[in-house]
Amino acid sequence: MELSATVLIIALTVLTSYLAWQKPNLMERWMFTPYQIQKKNQWDRFILSGFIHKDGTHLLFNMFTFYFFGRVVESFLMIKFGQTVGIGMYLLFYVGAIVIADIPTYFKHQSHSYYRALGASGGVAATVFGSIILMPLSDICLFGLLCLPGFALGVLFLIYSLVQSKKGGDGINHDAHLYGALFGIAFILIVSPQSALNFVDQIKSFRLF
């Protein structure tokens, strides 16, 4: 595994998740709890909650996904802006996605003392969709069985997240997935408007068979 900002983020997330598993008081303090943020001004929860996970399965799924898609976005930003600036922008991209993806959830649940969330969903969704804008025709395979071009899976994912967000009740913060994805798309298009034209050109060239 090549050392990169993506790998360092994964290593940090594994470490902080492990610490939270070992110390329940840390887990409780770092979780995204809008009520506590509003009541005690614990704004650091916006970031800290993105670096802890519920269990090993949750951590493995998020970091496995992040590793493959994060490298695409990281490489793109380094090529476009140079190594130092590119890495800085990549870190801003990832942390910014975690924070911004949770803002709608904060306003929705700031009066609900029972609500808690954790995980890197916003950051991971942003890297997945940032990668899709850059490489929309690259196949994404689900469980090694069903493979779809990135843009097609992206559309399905956005529809699913929107529907489930309105429905609620499954314990998953679908808002973070949805807004993280939108942040990833917007970020890439802002720093590289040409990516929009490249995306359209690639979609036009798509052939089902």
Predicted features and spans:
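A detector for small-residue-rich transmembrane helices and their helix-helix packing motifs
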Residues: 1-209
